[in-house]
Amino acid sequence: MFEDEPHAEGAAAVAAAREALQALCQELNLDEGSAAEALDDFTAIRGNYSLEGEVIHWLACSLYVACRKSIIPTVGKGVMEGNCVSLTRILRSAKLSLIQFFSKMKKWMDMSNLPQEFRERIERLERNFEVSTVIFKKFEPIFLDIFQNPYEEPPKLPRSRKQRRIPCSVKDLFNFCWTLFVYTKGNFRMIGDDLVNSYHLLLCCLDLIFANAIMCPNRRDLLNPSFKGLPSDFHAPDFKAAEEPPCIIAVLCDLHDGLLVEAKGIKEHYFKPYISKLFDKKILKGECLLDLSSFTDNSKAVNKEYEEYVLTVGDFDERIFLGADAEEEIGTPRKFTADTPFGKLTSQASVECNLQQHFEKKRSFAPSTPLTGRRYLQEKEAVTTPVASATQSVSRLQSIVAGLKSAPSEQLLNIFESCMRNPMGNIIKIVKGIGETFCQHYTQSTDKQPGSHIDFAVNRLKLAEILYYKILETIMVQETRRLHGMDMSVLLEQDIFHKSLMACCLEIVLFAYSSPRTFPWIIEVLDLQPFYFYKVIEVVIRSEEGLSRDMVKHLNSIEEQILESLAWTNNSALWEALHASANRVPSCEEVIFPNNFEIGNGGNVQGHLPMMPMSPIIHPRVKEVRTDSGSLRQDMQPLSPISVHERYSSPAAGSAKRRLFGDDPPKDTLMDKIMAEGTKLKIAPSSVTAESLSISPGQALLTMATTTVTGTTGRKVTVPLHGIANDAGEITLVPISMNPTQESTAESPVSLTAQSLIGTSPKQTHLTKAQDAHLTGVSKPKRTGSLALFYRKVYHLASVRLRDLCLKLDVSNELRRKIWTCFEFTLVHCPDLMKDRHLDQLLLCAFYIMAKVTKEERTFQEIMKSYRNQPQANSHVYRSVLLKSIPGGVVVYNGDCEMTDGDIEDATKTPNCSSEPVKEERGDLIKFYNTVYVGRVKSFALKYDLSNQDHIMDAPPLSPFPHIKQQPGSPRRISQQHSLYVSPHKNGAGLTPRSALLYKFNGSPSKSLKDINNMIRQGEQKTKKRVIAISGDADSPAKRLCQENDDVLLKRLQDVVSERANH
């Protein structure tokens, strides 16, 4: 079959591979069918890819896949999977370590495009390996604490079989205890890859062996005489053990980061019944496990049973940790004695370093820090082991809910009763339904996960329910304070809000226990759409201050997963939301807050619109009032610019009715009605509002104008107008939406207007005031609502990742903005490109095509090298990209034509569910770029080709790039134990001696510092910030004299407010 090989070198390589595989199969006693399949797969992969490293290692990967596919008929159970060849034997014969195997296996799965089920199997296997490695690293020091050091024992002398038995050594005890643990753990599959439960099961095994050593009169020499858990009279000459075996679970939990309640639960409900079953089956026997007459038989029986388990059910022989070659086979750091040679120490340290690097790269137990959401992280905690970190997470969770019940508190009940319709009955019904669904799926075995015991499910559920009511109460208190006196029925009647919040609490509990049921398991079993679930994540993080740093990282990474891929699946509710909003995808400028854009190259915020005149100069104090750093006290500042009400409802302005999760409907404010029905003001035939206004490249935004209309009450209202000039020379005046009936008081922290700056403010309705109070001085985006919030977060996430890539690749700001413009074009005009794909895929393609068009080329390898360093990077993102799906799904367009409205409508409609599975054609990112992406984006990208003069005039203006605040939570508390805060240095005029005391480190005399200390001791109050004054204050030395009169300043302030309100 190899005569057609084009090169002799290739034929020789295949022949060598065949020989190596034959030798490997003979050593493993493997059947010919699996060997032939393994060789065929290896040959096919080698023909398409360059396989680096030893051939035998890649053959081991191919052989393992072939063995897992093999089915062998059996006498009792029908069929058995796996050829009775364990992974450990394959790796041992191929001289391949487990860490190397997992690394190569991931690449092999990508190259072979193996099914998702097999990938999940490898992930479970790798997690089980990591759990076992972590547990073994804890097992050794705990064993040394209880028993004698097995490494200091003299070697056993060889003896004949006829010689009488000798007592077990400490080394034998060490091996027996570990083997009993891994065999017991294998029986409870729901415990196997759960780090917390596995650790407590280990403590139970150690407790059992300790009790047997104490109860055996001639085996107490195995114990460490300095162990703190020994009975108080242990060292007395006449010591006699009690009739009941002693329990040291509490001592071990206290000394070695255990959770007493959890460990006792494992011992009573799982371990003790199982050990009794082993005695009933005669696997274990004897009054004492360590008796001279029974230990050898017990050890052999447990090892035999475990070997059968590995061949039939298991895959990874965890006794590999006990072998002399453990360093080479797996990378386990070993215990060593004081006289261990230095060279051996260096070798072990190197292996331990490799193992640590593997865990750091894998991040199974300590999640990596995502690029977004870092402002919510607390200070770093002391470095701990994974077990200590996991048990501390559970302890922290238990401390958060300590003293609370899984029911509404009195304060929460009062909030429920204050609502127009008491929502308590419905909330309890929802929570109960979620609990029943959770317990059912948590205890149910599937192909992906073994089922857990109902006790575990009930325990996790109870913690989640307590946390749910605690966080719900915090949210309601914050919302009540934020939306003064507003009825909370609107929010509390949203079932999806309660379902999302409860799901988030369950995810927190599962993560704290290091459960193998990782996200998105919880939303899948609760049938909760990711597009709805993400909204609650930031709310939870802001509401519960007790969450650990790792927990916040985990929740942030979940939000990123949803924004980057989970919300873009074919059956996502996102497409329904787009369809409901007339298939109009919002641009970045429409959803980001106006003051959150980077300053353009020309020095103005509106750098993306070069023909727009620059804003008037803004007084520093005005700028301060209009931003988050204004005179509003820090403790009174809103926690987020988006309230929970806005996340879960999208009302029309001035309407008390809210639509769940729909985008805000077309603006139908009172002013619009006045303009359309009252005075029939005919300034222009256009009826669009400023919110829906889009400026094409051929149009120019002119300065502001005003007109006066009379409302139904007879009041006259001044309406600011946009002036837009088009190519035909016509000017269209478009009114900016505002509500003439708004009421507010001067002291309320409402959105800033020009009139409020000079002391008179328009009236505002109570509902609008409640909704806008949190936007203290910050202009709203053009589009708000559920869809706008989603795209705001998507644009923010993409901008953070693009900024990181550009910094690593030294990309100019100009090219970065062109990449961003191209990326935004694909989201807005080609939304179907994101369906069943990943945000990073479009971002990387936009990066490459714009770099190529602008002649600032970066090779694909350079881009991917920088991308892989991002915390969320995963090989499947660029190795497995959807090309097309049949039926339905993505339509691959040929040609350079842009999508029509009809195309967008078809793409955003969710296809009907079909019983037939969707067939997907997938390839790597390069293939997607060449076959799909270029055809859709090429004509747009070429408009920025500077070498072609014809395209320069057609190039659309560059989209604004979101700005990232370096210290959004300033001043930031850097320690939970001390009242120590850090804030960025404010650029401005230096403080004068009359207004403040100044001390420069390494520059000022000690007297200056003493003066500051004396002032603090005397309790002088901090000087309050001056409020802006329009009239000149002659006695203020720090204030420049204003050369303009009040009318001119008022006009400039009106321009500022109007401009900021609409851009």
Curated annotation (Swiss-Prot):
SUPFAM superfamilies: Cyclin-like. Cell-cycle arrest properties are inactivated by phosphorylation on Thr-332, Ser-640, Ser-959 and Ser-970 by CDK4. InterPro entries: Cyclin-like_dom, Cyclin-like_sf, RB_A, RB_B, RB_C, RB_fam, RB_N. Highly expressed in fetal heart and liver. Expressed at low levels in all other fetal tissues except skeletal muscle. High levels in neonatal spleen and thymus with low levels in other tissues. In adult, highly expressed in testis. Barely detectable in other tissues. Keywords: Cell cycle, Chromatin regulator, Nucleus, Phosphoprotein, Repressor, Transcription, Transcription regulation, Tumor suppressor. Pfam families: DUF3452, RB_A, RB_B, Rb_C. Residues 585-779 are annotated as: Spacer. The modification Phosphoserine is found at S640, S650, S748, S761, S959, S970, S983, S1004, S1036. Residues 383-944 are annotated as: Pocket. It is found in: Nucleus. Residues 383-584 are annotated as: Domain A. Residues 780-944 are annotated as: Domain B. GO terms for cellular component: nucleoplasm; nucleus; transcription regulator complex. Gene3D superfamilies: 1.10.472.140, Cyclin-like. The modification Phosphothreonine is found at T332, T369, T385, T992. GO terms for biological process: chromatin organization; negative regulation of cellular senescence; negative regulation of gene expression; negative regulation of transcription by RNA polymerase II; regulation of cell cycle. GO terms for molecular function: promoter-specific chromatin binding. Belongs to the retinoblastoma protein (RB) family. Key regulator of entry into cell division. Directly involved in heterochromatin formation by maintaining overall chromatin structure and, in particular, that of constitutive heterochromatin by stabilizing histone methylation. Recruits and targets histone methyltransferases KMT5B and KMT5C, leading to epigenetic transcriptional repression. Controls histone H4 'Lys-20' trimethylation. Probably acts as a transcription repressor by recruiting chromatin-modifying enzymes to promoters. Potent inhibitor of E2F-mediated trans-activation. May act as a tumor suppressor. Component of the DREAM complex (also named LINC complex) at least composed of E2F4, E2F5, LIN9, LIN37, LIN52, LIN54, MYBL1, MYBL2, RBL1, RBL2, RBBP4, TFDP1 and TFDP2. The complex exists in quiescent cells where it represses cell cycle-dependent genes. It dissociates in S phase when LIN9, LIN37, LIN52 and LIN54 form a subcomplex that binds to MYBL2. Interacts with AATF. Interacts with KDM5A. Interacts with KMT5B and KMT5C. Interacts with USP4. Interacts with RBBP9. This is Retinoblastoma-like protein 1.
